[in-house]
Amino acid sequence: MKHWLMKSEPDTFSWDHLVEKKRSMWDGVRNHMAAAHMREMKKGDLVFFYHSNIGKEIVGVMRVEKEHYPDPTDETAKFVVVDVVPVKPFKKPVTLAEIKANKKFADMRLVTHSRLSVSPVSEAHWAAICKMGGVTP
């Protein structure tokens, strides 16, 4: 199983929206590297839900429920979606500032490729961020 991070602007689609819907298609990704990461995702992979722009924080854990398929909102047919379900909210959101302040995250894609909306997360980073958020990995 791999771990990932996916970003969403909370005024467009937030953690609370996902919890309310219980399952959602993660659409609208138009970056080729991010889309390549989505193609690598497998059912059961765990994903951090990151609120971008507003908050700039990891707020919960999702699970990939359905592997990639064509994004119905993409007229070019180049991009894909995955379906995700909420697993658990963080007891304490982990902010981007906290992550950047800790040297052990210096090589995390969230820090090194800040505009990338979908990125892999190493086992060590996953465990450390879960601990910071007050949840078990």
Give short role names for the model-derived ranges:
Residues 5-7, 49-50, 61:
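Short, conserved beta-strand edge motifs with alternating hydrophobic and charged residues
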Residues 28-32, 66-70, 103-104:
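Short acidic (Asp/Glu) patches
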Residues 57-67:
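Short beta-strand-centered aromatic/proline hotspots
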Residues 1-10, 71-137:
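Contiguous surface segments at macromolecular interaction interfaces
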Residues 17, 41-42, 57, 75-77:
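Short glycine/proline-enriched turns and hinge-like loops at secondary-structure junctions
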Residues 1-43, 136-137:
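Compositionally biased, charged N-terminal/linker segments
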Residues 50-56:
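Short, charged beta-turn/beta-strand-edge "cap" motif at the junction between a beta-strand
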